[in-house]
Amino acid sequence: MSAGGEHLKDEGTRRQVVLAGGIAGLVSRFCVAPLDVVKIRLQLQIHSLSDPTSHQNIKGPVYKGTLPTIRSIVREEGITGLWKGNIPAELMYVCYGAIQFAAYRTTTQALSQLDPYRLPPPAESFVAGATAGGLATASTYPLDLLRTRFAAQGTERVYTSLYASVRDIAQNEGPKGFFRGCSAAVGQIVPYMGLFFATYESLRPVMSGLHDLPFGSGDAAAGVVASVLAKTGVFPLDLVRKRLQVQGPTRSKYVHRNIPEYQGVYNTMAMIVRTQGMRGLYRGLTVSLFKAAPASAVTMWTYEKSLHYLRELEVASE
């Protein structure tokens, strides 16, 4: 972490920020891939875990909790099942990280020039984070959709390769098929990244002096706290996004064969509440927090360290 808890907008050149963001996305995705697959499987599961009668006539596995789901995937699909969808996911995380941090830096720098009408620092961070998150999500959304569809595949493969999936969606669903659930994704990520960066920037100065933390840095701890608070608030929209991403001609071919037909964000939320109750909107929240906390910690720690290394490299080359 930069000395004194320096603001992210004041760190590095644009090129350094893009490279550090891409590296952070790459490392973060690899570390949390298994939890991401588990989260997606749980989010797509529609039957009640507390009502055994709802399991009747279910085609596909019945997952109960994070560890049992991991064991079930490994038993039925092998250890590689925990990394399904990793290629489009890695591409997405690299591009997302690069775009997000570059957009955040650019937006915060622009907002800082608004004197005498400048926003308070937390509001600046919220607006910049929301803008960066929305832009990065919209730009990389087709990869996000492909990641979800591959992770939702069971032992019977819906798509044989990344190329085959792109070709199939283009032929059978058209260009709009790559953006199913995009409105829910943007609606979720805008407040999420706004809250995340506002919380993170506020905690960085406080945690910069905590030298007893792992790796001697407070970046990871600040990322964990910010992520947990933000993720809990917007989780229902994340679940809706996943349900919408697997709509279309292949809806009944994924590991959960009984995924209902959903149309639109509002109608999807209403249908989930009507058939599964309010708890249905938070299915997979626990594993989502288990994933989001370390993912954010790894992302921010790797970003800060990569940026620090790139800055030192530039100084050494001068």
Swiss-Prot record:
One of its GO terms (cellular component) is mitochondrial inner membrane. It is found in: Mitochondrion inner membrane. The chain crosses the membrane at residues 12-28, 91-107, 125-141, 181-197, 221-237, 284-301. Gene3D superfamilies: Mitochondrial carrier domain. It is a multi-pass membrane protein. Its main location: mitochondrion. One of its GO terms (biological process) is transmembrane transport. Solcar repeats lie at residues 12-110, 120-206, 214-309. Keywords: Membrane, Mitochondrion, Mitochondrion inner membrane, Repeat, Transmembrane, Transmembrane helix, Transport. Belongs to the mitochondrial carrier (TC 2.A.29) family. PANTHER family: SOLUTE CARRIER FAMILY 25. Mitochondrial transporter that mediates uptake of thiamine pyrophosphate (ThPP) into mitochondria. This is Mitochondrial thiamine pyrophosphate carrier 1. It comes from Aspergillus oryzae (strain ATCC 42149 / RIB 40). The gene is tpc1.
